Amino acid sequence: MEVLVDVEITPKFLGLKFMKYTLENREVWKNKKLISIDANSSWFGKRYYVKGRREEGGFRIEGSAFSGVIKDTFATTSYFTPDFLKRRIWVSTQDGTPLEIKTRKLRNRKVSFNDKDYSVTEWEISGDLELTLQYDQHKNWVGSGFTVGNYPARFILNNRKNNIHKIWQNS
């Protein structure tokens, strides 16, 4: 399974842009294991990268903040299938850093999107990465909450069609 991620975050305050974050990421997965990654990102104009490939004995990463081999089964930080909640190591798709995380189910709640209410289950991610993740009743990832430079940010998936959780289950 090939996953392509293209992100641009440009928050504005009083009409002024105060930062810009971009990420272009290509991941190849097979049997729920990452085979390769090629990611480039920019934050406040500084460039970051991650390149990696599965090899005998683990997954070799060359990144702007970490280079080495990870032997554990891990997740990445660009897409959040519910299976990732069981994995204790997540690799930053910004700079390659292995992140030790813990997960905790919070609660079910309602969120509104396009004038329609949805029931979601919210999870807290803590440790080297702090965020909340939301999944709908079909286990599709539909939202996130995190902090960007001291400011709370909320992400809600605009298009619920073609969510890759079904594809992930069969990969």
Language model features with spans:
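Acidic/charged, solvent-exposed loop-and-adjacent secondary-structure segments enriched in E/D, K/R, S/T
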Residues: E56-A75
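Acidic, serine/threonine-rich low-complexity disordered tracts
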Residues: M1-E55, A75-S171
